[in-house]
C-alpha cells in the first residue's frame, strides 16, 4: 500500500506519519480490504486507537485521531484512486498496483511498510468441482501452476505487484 497525492498538489504530507496535515483524505470504507489495511497501519503506527476488528473504526474516529482532517469515505480502492487522481482529495491510501498507468496524475508519497499494514496478499487455490470435466480441471490447475512461475512474477511486477513475499 502507499500514500498518494495528485501531481502538483503541493501537499505538505510526506507519508502516513503526517497524513493529518492534508486538507482532505480519501479513505476506503472499513469493510473493504484497503480500508482495513489503512486502519491497521494507523493503529500500528500509534496514530489511532485500536479495536479488535479494525474494520469497525469509523471515518469520524479516523478524522478525530488525525486532528480533524476531512475524510471522504470511499466505497473501494478504485474510488479512492479516482478521487485523488482527479484532485477531489489531497491524499489517499491505495494499493501500489492501483497507481499503474496513472504515473502522470499521481505521486507516491510513501510506500507503507508491511510491519504497519500486515501482509497484503492475493491468495490463489484450485478448488474441487464435481461438475467440471477433465479439460476444465486440468486448465484450472495449469493456470494456478502458471501463477507461481517466474514468467508470471515478471508480469505481476510490471503492473506494480510486490512478488517478494513468502509462499
How does the language model describe each region?
Residues 2-167:
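Exported/periplasmic ABC-transporter solute-binding proteins
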Amino acid at each position: 500500500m502507499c500514500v498518494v497525492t495528485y501531481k502538483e498538489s503541493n501537499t505538505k504530507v510526506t507519508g502516513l506519519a503526517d497524513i493529518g496535515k492534508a486538507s482532505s483524505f480519501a479513505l476506503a470504507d472499513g469493510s473493504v480490504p484497503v480500508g482495513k489495511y489503512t486502519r491497521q497501519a494507523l493503529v500500528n503506527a500509534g496514530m489511532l486507537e485500536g479495536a479488535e476488528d479494525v474494520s469497525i473504526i469509523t471515518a469520524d474516529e479516523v478524522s478525530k485521531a488525525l486532528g480533524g482532517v476531512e475524510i471522504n469515505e470511499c466505497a473501494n480502492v478504485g474510488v479512492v484512486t479516482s478521487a485523488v487522481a482527479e484532485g477531489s482529495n489531497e491524499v489517499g491510501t491505495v494499493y501500489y498496483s492501483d497507481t499503474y498507468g496513472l504515473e502522470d496524475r499521481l505521486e507516491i508519497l510513501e510506500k507503507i511498510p508491511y510491519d504497519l499494514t500486515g501482509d497484503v496478499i492475493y491468495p490463489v487455490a484450485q478448488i474441487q468441482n464435481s461438475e467440471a470435466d477433465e479439460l476444465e480441471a486440468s486448465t484450472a490447475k495449469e493456470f494456478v501452476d502458471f501463477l507461481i512461475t517466474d514468467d508470471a512474477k515478471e508480469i505481476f511486477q510490471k503492473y506494480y505487484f510486490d512478488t517478494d513475499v513468502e509462499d
